[in-house]
């Protein structure tokens, strides 16, 4: 529990812990990502050749902490409360204030933990945290048209279809159209969660 007891912010839900990544998470992250490469690569942009290097991971950890302190990115790892096992990650990026109060959503989950409702629980917890602690009122997301699991997740969490982003993002070296979703918090319906942080 030493990696969790003194860290803030920590978001707790029924089964999950969400927190900033630490350098100590490196080995667990490499194992999970490599085990899930085939599962994840078809949905994600191509990776840097040094993607799995510890040095680059350290830079991402510092980036996450710096941008959290600036309140412009929330980049959290997701762990099981039962055994503190790393299962995935969730990010709110491009956080904008003023008249926008919005952010862009990204997430990933290890293959062995899919279809268990984990990301649904994690996303609902993140949305409550973002609304209550950061002042975000709108979250936008984009997914490939054939990523049925991702579309079902967003729709289950009450994201609404907004259209198609033409040649929105490069996946596997090719510009791909994406389905665009968004949620505003006055339309969100979710169970209350115990949330600590900020």
State each model region's role:
Residues 1-28, 32-39, 75-198:
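Acyl-donor (CoA/ACP) binding surface of acyl/acetyltransferases
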């Amino acid at each position: 529990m030493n990696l969790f007891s003194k860290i803030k912010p920590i978001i707790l839900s029924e089964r999950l812990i969400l927190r900033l990544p630490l350098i100590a998470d490196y080995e667990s992250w490499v194992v999970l990502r490599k085990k899930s490469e085939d599962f994840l690569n078809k949905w994600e942009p191509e990776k840097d050749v040094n993607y799995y290097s510890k040095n680059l991971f350290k830079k991402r950890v510092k980036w996450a902490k710096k941008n959290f302190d600036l309140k412009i990115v929330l980049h959290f790892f997701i762990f099981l409360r039962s055994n503190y096992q790393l299962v995935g990650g969730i990010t709110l990026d491009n956080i904008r204030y003023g008249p926008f109060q919005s952010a862009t959503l990204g997430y990933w989950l290890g293959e062995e933990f899919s279809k268990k409702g984990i990301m649904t629980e994690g996303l609902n917890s993140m949305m409550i945290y973002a609304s209550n602690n950061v002042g975000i009122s709108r979250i936008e997301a984009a997914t490939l048209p054939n990523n049925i699991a991702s579309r079902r997740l967003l729709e289950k969490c009450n994201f609404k279809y907004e259209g198609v982003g033409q040649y929105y993002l490069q996946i596997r070296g090719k510009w791909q159209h994406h389905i665009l979703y968004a949620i505003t918090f006055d339309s969100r319906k979710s169970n209350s969660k115990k949330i600590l942080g900020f």
